[in-house]
Structures are given as C-alpha cells and as structure tokens.
C-alpha cells in the first residue's frame, strides 16, 4: 500500500496509542483503520469499508458520544484524535492531535453518566499495606483509604461500584480474580515518581503536609494525577483536596453488611437508599449514598446532624420552601468539571446560571438556621452568565445562537448582515426580474453551488450576457453574476465570522467560570449538605420517624420497624428490643417466614440510620454508638470463587471474630446451617461463646433450638421467639417478638415448614403427601436403639431453601 501523508500521520499517532482504539477525525467523520476498524465495525454494527486497501469504519462527528459510550461499555479504551485547525484555512496536511483518552473511569459527559458517582481507583500495595485512591473525575472528588486488610479494601471498592481499577503490573492478576468484570488499566513505575512535586503542582500549594498523607498515599495520589492527565490530555485538573476514609471518623462497612442490609441499589431490589432518597439535587443524592455507606462514629457529629434535621422538621413551611428552591439546582460539581476540561456545552452554563439564581433566595431562607453557612454569591460571574448566554442556546457554539444579542457589538453586526440577507436577496431578485423581463426568475442556494439565479428553458433567450452559467438541469439552468458572487462572499464570511466569534466568546465565558471554581465547588458542597439534611427531615415527617438518643451501652427500641419492608407491607408489626451490658446476646428462635431475619435486619438499619444523622422508624430508640455493624446472613455460595455455602459462611464469621469489639453490633442469621446438624450446632455454640466473651451486642436468629440453652450457662444471654398462632389447620405468623423459646411441643408431630409451603402456593395434594411422609418416614428413621422415637424438636423443621 502506498503511504500517503495522511496515512503516515495516522500511523505516527497510532504508535503512541497502541493499546487504544484510535478515532481519527476526517472532515465530518471519525475514522478507524486496520484492526481498530474491524473492532469498531463489529461492536457498533456499522459497515466496514476500505481506503487505499486499509480496512476503515467511520462514525459521524456529531454522533461521537453515542458510539463512544458503546465502545467504552464494551470494555475498550478509545483515543480521540481531532483536527486542530480549520480545513479551509490550511493548504497543507491538517494538524491533528489526540485530545482525550476515554476509559470507563475518565468520563465527564452527562450522556455517559447517571446521577451516582463514577469512581476509578488507583490501587497500590507496598509490603503488607494497601492504598486505594478513589476519584470521580466528573466531580473532582478524591478519597483515600489505607489498610493492611485486603478484604476491607475490596469491600470498599465493591461498595463504591468502581468502574475502573488502575494498578501496577504486580497486582493485575489478583485484582482480576477478586473483581472480575471491572476494567483494569496497568501502569508502570514512572507514574509513582516525584510524588510530592506532582501533588504540589496540581493543587498549587507548597506545603502539602496538611493533607496528612503517608508516603504510600502520596505516591498513589501522584499516580492518580498522572493518569488523569494522560486521559484528559490536560495539565490542569479539577481535583478536590483528598479526604481520608478512616475508622477514626467513619464506620467501615464490609460488602456482606452492605448487601445483607440492602443499603444501596444492587441486585436485591428495594433498599434503604431508595426509601430515604428524596433529594432534590444530584449532588445531594451522591452525598446521601456516601453517608449511608460511611455512618459516623463520633457522637457529637451525629448529634449535630440530628439537631439540624430536627430544626428543619419543626419548621415545615421553611423546609418546603428550601426543598422547592433546591429543585431548581443543577449538577454544579459536574458542570465545573466539564468547564475545567473544556468539555462544557452552552446548556451547562445555563444550568449554572439557574443554580446561582437560587443562592440569594436560599441564603434568605437559611438565615434562621445557625448550622448552615451563608453561601458565597459570585455576583460578577452571575451577571456575566445573564448577559452572555442565551436562555435556550444551540447545542454547541457555531451551531446557532449561543451568545445573547447586545453582548458583543461585532457579533451583532454580522448577525444583522445575515438577518437582512433574505431581504436583500428579495430586492436583488426583483431587480433582476425587472432588468431581464423574466417574471419566473428565482434566486436560490445550495451547499454545492452556493447562491444562484434559476431560469427556465423557455426564458433562456432573455438571459443577459453578464450571466455566468453554473449548472444545467432538465427544465432550467442556473447562473451567477458578479453582484451575486460579491453578496455570497460577504454572507459566507459573515457566517464563518459568527461561528468564530461565538466559539471565542463562549471560551472566554468558560475561562471566567474557571476563575470562580473554588467558590462554585464550595457552593456545590454546601448545597449537597443542605439537600441531604432537608431530605432526612422530610423523611422523618413522611414516614413518622423518631429522633434517636444515645447511651454508652443501652439499646432500647420501642415500636421498631424495618424502614424498607414497612414501605411495601400493609400493617407492618412493630417490635421492641432491650439490650445492655448485662443482657447483650439475644438468641431468636422461630419457624421460617415468622420474621426473625426482618427483625434482626431492622435493628441493624435503625442503628445505622441513627449514625448517619437520620431519625429512625421507632416510637423510641436509645442506642449505643457502634464502631462496626457485622452481618452473617443467608445461604450463599461463591461458584466463581469455588467456595461452598459453608465455606463462605465460615469466611464471613472468621472476619467478624477477627474484627468485632465491645462496641460492635453483630447480626447473625442461621450460622452453622451449611453443614451437618451436629457440626453446625457445635460451631454455632463455640462462636456464641467467643462473641459473649468479646462483650459486643449480638442478635442471633437460629433454627438450632439447642442454642437457647446458652441462657442457662451465660447470664448475658436472653431468648426471644416469634409468636405463632394456630387457627384450626392454619398457622398464623404474628411477626411479634416475645420473650422465650420457640414451642418445643410440636416436635416431629408438627412442621411449620410444610405450612410455609402451603402459603407459598404448593398444591394441596403435595402438602398432604408431605405430612404423610413426615408422620411415617421420619419417625421410622429416627428410632433409637432402645426402641424410643427421637423427637425432632431439637431442630425446628425448615422449608428447604
């Protein structure tokens, strides 16, 4: 294949981005060549063509984001190569450069993103210590977590639903195994060089010690900065100062607890976030999720939030006015990011203007609340946005009106020329008709031939000599004249100049926005906080929640409810619980579907909600401030990891036994069920003894009736059961938690499991047969050597999972 200058240019750029699909701007299309073209054609289902024997596939430039999204979602890294000069102004080969590298975590455009955070993470291990630096490029947020506990770091990555992991080569295989399906980018040692200088440069500070980062965290942050520079092709980044996630301030939740308590949207459907999320702003929704994932452990900070929620709840009129104002607020964080990376569109600036218009009114409404800081109002920027940007602008500068009339005299002059062009064309047309006597003479325009005079074949004999032929059609011919040519030159120059001016003026306005970045981010942060606190106040009113109070060791819940289940269940049954240092271990027995699991989950959720600063679903709640909430629930296997249900169960229990302290809350459901009955009881008993000795608060829901005997050996243990009533042949699950032990008297003569099967809709003939088998078969098998029948009351019969 003969190498043209264009293809040489392409190959030179492609050499620098070998691991990316290169989309190369050619006029109105982005083209991919060679293997990239085959990939693009296959993924996007577009035609594969050829250019000089090179496979080629193209997408229209105006539809770039639509196709780009599909490529990134398919797991590809894409380098965008743009034309850096106007084709009309260059007689040589147009200069082209890569303007960005798109990966799942390096995205700022709204089309790609939901309201939730889109985190990438730089993961580094040094000796036995891990450092994870999370960054949402679209908001500029940076979070750092260090730990010697690999599982803790993995849990955080799962909770944050990271879209991209950036790590050194030595970690790649481990990460792929532990987090399959997540996009991974491997980086070399250069990314970790000169860390302090890199951090100083990007944050524009000389003293970085107030960040209080370890050398490992500093290196990891530096790697993040260099990687974002590489993807955004920019030396200036929109990054907020790093925030450290530590146990000193926050509760660290493992992935099992996040999943078992259904805290955030996932595979299990209804969740706490969806119930509480009545936020009015995208920033507020993201912050609420963060609060749920990181409950506070400092009592004063919790009380501060609760005080704010209570004050807002008490003044319903103000609360409604505040929420109405917040509903006009747009996603300031992401707008600032797009402006910083030169990805903003005119509608972003309109949204920013709308948000700023709310600030003075909001300041007025918040003036009575001392827990809110007065929002800074950038008057000059607001005035500029009001004067410069149209209310309903075109999609991008140069595509139509973006800059308001009156902002630029030069732009107005060219617009006047264009707007009066139709009028002038009509005048020209009338003059030519009079001059030639051709009444059907028309002046028109098309993109190929420009402006023309059209004359029918019947009138060709009247055409003057100064008419220059441009095009012959079936029934007519088209001409031009020196006057029409001059008019066309002026019009085309005006259009071109309008496009140039609009782009230039829009860039200037964006530069002014950049100067106010810090103020805008402060406004965004405070708006998010106001939104979440107002939402929690609204939830408290809507759902009839109560303010919790705190105690060193006492847990007293009266009329407690499950915040999620009650939303989708009629006549939810409230329950009470009392625990303290003397009675800190509660064993709960009862048949399936009686409500054991719901009860222990609601205790966990009430505790967690209190520590995010929310009112809680109870008539009264006195709670300790827990350092951790642990859960071990349900039968789950790990087919991908090759772990059985029982092994998963024991792995999770090992984590709890390793980390639970006197200040922890431990919720256990069916521990020991994944193995044989005797093994299971023995393990469950031994685990219980260990947790009792630790001094943590424990709720243990079980079918092992033997565990109720713990009460006889340990004064810290109390037994609870779920009250079940029988009405004739039917079983009624009251869902009421009472003192005592599940009724042993039924033994093998009665199975609630079969009743559960009946409720689930198993046919009646199958139910009758199950009772027959239970009566005949199980009794025969359970004969002791001495001829006596062994009672099966030792384990409450289960409906098979």
Swiss-Prot record:
Q: Which SUPFAM superfamilies match?
A: DNA repair protein MutS, domain I, DNA repair protein MutS, domain II, DNA repair protein MutS, domain III, P-loop containing nucleoside triphosphate hydrolases
- Purpose: This protein is involved in the repair of mismatches in DNA. It is possible that it carries out the mismatch recognition step. This protein has a weak ATPase activity.
Q: What is this protein called?
A: DNA mismatch repair protein MutS
Highest taxon, organism lineage: Bacteria
The answer on whether this UniProt entry bears the keyword Chaperone reads no
Q: Name one GO molecular function term.
A: mismatched DNA binding
Q: Record's family?
A: Belongs to the DNA mismatch repair MutS family.
Regions crossing the membrane: none
* Signal sequence, start to end: none
One Gene Ontology cellular component annotation? Answer: cytosol
Q: Organism source for this protein? A: Thermotoga neapolitana (strain ATCC 49049 / DSM 4359 / NBRC 107923 / NS-E)
Cite the binding residues for ATP: 590-597
Could you confirm whether the keyword DNA repair appears in this record?
Answer: yes
> Which Gene Ontology BP terms does the record give?
mismatch repair
Gene3D superfamilies per record: 1.10.1420.10, DNA repair protein MutS, domain I (3.40.1170.10), MutS, connector domain (3.30.420.110), P-loop containing nucleotide triphosphate hydrolases (3.40.50.300)
Q: Which SMART domains match?
A: MUTSac (SM00534), MUTSd (SM00533)
Q: What keywords does the record list, in alphabetical order?
A: ATP-binding, DNA damage, DNA repair, DNA-binding, Nucleotide-binding
One of the Pfam families matching this protein, by short name? MutS_I
């Amino acid at each position: 294949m003969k190498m043209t200058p264009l293809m040489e240019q392409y190959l030179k750029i492609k050499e620098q981005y070998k691991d990316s699909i290169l989309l190369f701007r050619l006029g109105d299309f982005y083209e991919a060549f060679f293997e990239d073209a085959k990939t693009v054609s296959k993924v996007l289902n577009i035609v594969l063509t050829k250019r000089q024997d090179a496979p080629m596939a193209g997408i229209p430039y105006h539809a770039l984001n639509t196709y780009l999204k599909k490529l990134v979602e398919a797991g590809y890294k894409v380098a965008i190569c743009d034309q850096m000069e106007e084709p009309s102004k260059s007689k040589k080969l147009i200069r082209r450069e890569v303007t960005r590298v798109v990966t799942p975590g390096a995205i700022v455009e709204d089309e790609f993103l939901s309201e939730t955070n889109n985190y990438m993470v730089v993961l580094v291990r040094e000796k036995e210590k891990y450092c994870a630096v999370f960054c949402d490029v679209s908001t500029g947020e940076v979070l750092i977590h260090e730990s010697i506990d690999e599982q803790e770091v993995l849990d955080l990555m799962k909770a944050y639903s990271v879209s991209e992991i950036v790590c050194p080569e030595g970690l790649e295989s481990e990460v792929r195994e532990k987090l399959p399906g997540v996009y991974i980018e491997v980086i070399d040692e250069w990314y970790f060089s000169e860390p302090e200088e890199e951090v100083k440069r990007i944050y524009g500070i000389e003293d970085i010690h107030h960040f209080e980062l370890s050398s490992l965290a500093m290196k990891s942050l530096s790697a993040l900065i260099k990687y974002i520079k590489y993807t955004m092709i920019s030396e200036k980044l929109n990054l907020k100062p790093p925030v450290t996630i530590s146990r000193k301030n926050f509760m660290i939740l493992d992935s099992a607890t996040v999943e078992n308590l259904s805290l955030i949207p996932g595979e299990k459907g209804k969740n706490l976030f969806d119930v509480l999320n009545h936020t009015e702003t995208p920033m507020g929704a993201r912050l609420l999720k963060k609060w749920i994932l990181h409950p506070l452990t400092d009592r004063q900070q919790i009380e501060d939030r609760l005080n704010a929620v209570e004050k807002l709840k008490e003044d319903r009129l103000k609360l409604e006015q505040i929420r109405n104002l917040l509903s006009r607020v747009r996603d300031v964080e992401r707008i600032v990011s797009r402006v910083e990376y030169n990805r903003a569109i005119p509608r972003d600036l309109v949204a920013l203007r709308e948000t700023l218009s709310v600030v003075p009114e909001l300041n007025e409404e918040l003036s009575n609340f001392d827990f809110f800081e007065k929002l800074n109002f950038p008057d000059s920027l607001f005035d500029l946005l009001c004067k410069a940007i149209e209310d309903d602008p075109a999609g991008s500068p140069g595509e139509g009106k973006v800059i308001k009339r009156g902002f630029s005299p030069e732009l107005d002059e060219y617009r006047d020329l264009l707007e009066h062009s139709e009028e002038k064309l009509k005048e020209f047309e009338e003059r030519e008709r009079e001059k030639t006597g051709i009444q059907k003479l028309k002046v028109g325009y098309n993109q190929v031939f420009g402006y023309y005079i059209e004359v029918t074949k019947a009138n060709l004999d009247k055409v003057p000599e100064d008419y220059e032929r441009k095009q012959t059609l079936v029934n007519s011919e088209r001409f031009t004249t020196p006057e029409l040519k001059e008019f066309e030159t002026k019009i085309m120059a005006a259009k071109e100049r309008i496009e140039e001016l609009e782009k230039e003026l829009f860039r200037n306005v964006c530069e002014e926005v950049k100067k106010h970045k810090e103020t805008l981010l402060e406004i965004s942060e405070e708006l998010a906080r106001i939104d979440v606190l107002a939402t929690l106040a609204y939830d408290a009113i809507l759902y009839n929640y109560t303010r919790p109070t705190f105690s060193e060791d006492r847990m007293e819940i009266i009329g407690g409810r499950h915040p999620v289940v009650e939303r989708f269940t009629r006549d939810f049954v409230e329950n009470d619980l009392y625990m303290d240092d003397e009675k800190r271990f509660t064993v709960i027995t009862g048949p399936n579907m009686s409500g054991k699991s719901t009860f222990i989950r609601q205790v966990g959720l009430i505790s967690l909600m209190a520590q995010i600063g929310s009112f809680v679903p109870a008539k009264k709640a006195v709670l300790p401030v827990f350092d951790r909430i642990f859960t071990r629930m349900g039968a789950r296997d790990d087919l991908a990891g090759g772990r059985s249900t029982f092994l998963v169960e024991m792995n999770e229990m090992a984590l709890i036994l390793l980390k639970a302290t006197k200040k922890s809350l431990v919720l256990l459901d069916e521990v020991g069920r994944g193995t044989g009955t005797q093994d299971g009881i023995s393990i469950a008993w031994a685990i219980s003894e260990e947790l009792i000795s630790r001094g943590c608060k424990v709720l243990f829901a079980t079918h092992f009736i033997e565990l109720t005997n713990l009460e006889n050996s340990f004064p810290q243990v109390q037994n609870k059961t779920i009250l079940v009533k029988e009405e004739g042949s039917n079983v009624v699950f009251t869902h009421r938690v009472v003192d005592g032990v599940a009724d042993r008297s039924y033994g093998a003569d009665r199975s609630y499991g079969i009743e559960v099967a009946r409720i689930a809709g198993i046919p009646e003939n199958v139910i009758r047969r199950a009772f027959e088998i239970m009566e005949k078969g199980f009794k025969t098998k359970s004969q002791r050597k001495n001829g006596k029948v062994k009672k099966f009351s030792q384990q409450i019969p289960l409906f098979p999972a």
